Swiss-Prot record:
One of its GO terms (biological process) is regulation of growth. This is Protein RALF-like 25. It holds the Pfam family RALF. InterPro entries: RALF. The keyword Signal applies. Belongs to the plant rapid alkalinization factor (RALF) family. Its main location: secreted. It comes from Arabidopsis thaliana (Mouse-ear cress).
Length: 74
């Protein structure tokens, strides 16, 4: 009886794992970004070698030449 239960448990686990792997393929096609799909349209190529740059470079708005922080004497 124990061997029958072990065999039944192994068969059920194989069936469950097979169904989970089958569902992974469907999720790839639910992507909203067309560039991330398997057959991307032209112009969506990524450049993995391109270094990242910050979106907004920090700038105080003044340089030492403009003397923006200078306090004027009355």
């Amino acid at each position: 009886m124990k061997t029958f239960m072990i065999i039944l448990l192994v068969i059920c686990s194989i069936l469950i794992v097979g169904r989970v792997e089958a569902n992974d393929n469907k999720r790839k096609y639910l992507l909203l970004d067309p560039c991330l799909r398997p057959n991307a349209p032209p112009g969506c190529h990524r450049q993995p070698y391109k270094p990242r740059t910050p979106v907004n470079v920090y700038s105080r708005g003044c340089t030492t030449i403009n003397r923006c922080r200078r306090v004027q004497n009355p």
